[in-house]
Amino acid sequence: MNLLLAIAIFAGVDVYFLKDSPDLLVRVLPEIQTEQLTLYYSFSGQDWDSTVIEKEGRFFDAVLQSPDMPSIVGIYSVYDDYVDDNSGNLYLYELKLFPKMLMPFSLTDLETIIIQARKKIMARIHIDEAITLLDYADHMLSVVPYIKNSPNELRKNTLQIEVNKLRGQIVR
């Protein structure tokens, strides 16, 4: 039991900025033993790209060249017919190059932001804050990577509809 818990805690994807570079180091620790995996990634909703990486020590490391103005990177890996996509949510990270910032991110986070905006709009208080929250959510939804025909695509589209609906309720 403890071994399974340790695997669940330590397996997954970690992302780091390389020193003095906008490029990213992606480190994967697979849930099952394997010698090779395919890493899929998408910056800010661009087409998915992939790279095959081999095990070096305990980890699989890949360096991804960051585009000029990335907002978000989505990552998942495939190995031995197993898809590691963070339980269908992808591994998402919000990126800023200046100053450097790398923060885990999820559609659940956006959902929480939209709920907060809805509360402010319904209470008719702090409408300016609600507008800021909706602007942020709208921007992130426009660039968040997703796998076509996946539950995440449906969830993303549903959140976008909610943002548009809330914008229509704002009385300026």
What are these regions (language model features)?
Residues M1-L3:
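Positively charged n-region of N-terminal signal peptides that target proteins for export
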Residues L5-R172:
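Glycan-association/targeting regions that enable binding to alpha-glucans and other polysaccharides
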